[in-house]
Amino acid sequence: MRFVAPPPRSGDNSPSPSPSSGISEEILSRSSDPPLEFSPPLIAMVVVLAAAFLFVTYSRLISRRFLSPLFRRFRRWRCRRRRLLHLSSASSASTSSSDLRSFSPFPFDSFHYSSYSPYGLDDSVIKTLPLFLYSAAACTGKPAVGKTSAANCRDCAVCLLEFEEGDYVRTLPLCFHAFHLECIDEWLRSHPNCPLCRTAILGSAGVLTPMSPFVPLMAPRIRPSLDDEENNAIIIRGEITPSRSNWNTIAADTTNDQEIRASVEEQSSPAISRFRELKRSYSFECERESESERVTMEPATVSPWRYRRSTWNKRQSPFGNLISKSRVFSFRYYRSTKSPFFRRRSSAGVFYPISERIPATGSSSRRTKSMTSPMFFRTAPHSSSRLRCGDPEALLSPERWRRRDTCRAEM
């Protein structure tokens, strides 16, 4: 069978559209759409961010180039102004309040804050320290082994400011730390060491460490100062001691020479010996005895129980009249009240162990000898805790010397 195609219709005579014509139509349709519009809030946000970025960048550039030197100069000017104000106030105070300055414990003529500490260095010593001009080109140097090079110090540790080209820098001799000239000079007037590492400026042998002028308020009651009296006694001794030429003229006779030396020592030595004995008694909390007294007191002082008693006994404070009851815990007192091995003898007022009150039969120990010594029972009623504590009032009281004289008379 054959299929016959139908004849074309009259309306289908137009040609089919080509693909190029379809693409052009799509482009025309897209171009006819309305353009994209940005909202005003979005535009405002973008503008604000851009302005902030420009402002921060500009401020950083200005602060690095211009503001940091201005702030540095302003701080230096303020420090100099403060120093001038202190100096002017010190000069006015020195002229108007001479009585107050004489009462002040500081041996200085001005009230400048740098002179409050007596441990600083003198200006003549400070001026001997090396002085340099700072150079940024020298910052590339490497420090020595175990030391810090001045070239690596880019800022001052006192004022916390960076060094500038041409600044006067003072370098410390031992630690090689560098600081501004004005900063380190002001520091060294009140401190003898480095602000960073605390290294002594002049070494251990050259540090100026005078004695502190501060004196405790309660020192005269507890321990009087005997340094001035000892120095005066030494000066008097130097005045009394004859010169070497006088000794050579007197040395013709040996006996006369010895007599003169003995007389000079008798005139000057009692004061010095008394002061030294008192100072040692304050240190060891006991009084120095002569050789004869030590020999006679040997049986009463060699007992280990006596040392234990003096060690654990409750000390009385020299300010006992101000305190109603002692708050210091005493192991000796607590043990004596709780332990059955200790009994109290009401006549002597001293605690004795049972082994010492009733010595063992058949043998005698040093402890029993010390307890049976007549000197112990003579001195026990007269013993004072103030003497054991090293109270100066008890050491210097006439009652103590009267008791010693009575003890010697009884011997």
UniProtKB/Swiss-Prot annotation:
It is a single-pass membrane protein. It catalyses: S-ubiquitinyl-[E2 ubiquitin-conjugating enzyme]-L-cysteine + [acceptor protein]-L-lysine = [E2 ubiquitin-conjugating enzyme]-L-cysteine + N(6)-ubiquitinyl-[acceptor protein]-L-lysine. One of its GO terms (biological process) is protein ubiquitination. Pathway: Protein modification; protein ubiquitination. A zinc finger (RING-type) spans 156-198. InterPro entries: ATL1/ATL16-like (IPR044600), Znf_RING (IPR001841), Znf_RING/FYVE/PHD (IPR013083). It is found in: Membrane. Residues 10-21 have a biased composition (Low complexity). Residues 1-32 are annotated as: Disordered. Signal peptide: none annotated. The keyword Phosphoprotein does not apply. Its EC number is 2.3.2.27. One of its GO terms (molecular function) is zinc ion binding. The chain crosses the membrane at residues 36-56. SUPFAM superfamilies: RING/U-box. GO terms for cellular component: chloroplast; membrane; vesicle. Keywords: Membrane, Metal-binding, Transferase, Transmembrane, Transmembrane helix, Ubl conjugation pathway, Zinc, Zinc-finger. The RING-type zinc finger domain mediates binding to an E2 ubiquitin-conjugating enzyme. Belongs to the RING-type zinc finger family. ATL subfamily. This is RING-H2 finger protein ATL65. The lineage of its organism: Eukaryota, Viridiplantae, Streptophyta, Embryophyta, Tracheophyta. The gene is ATL65.
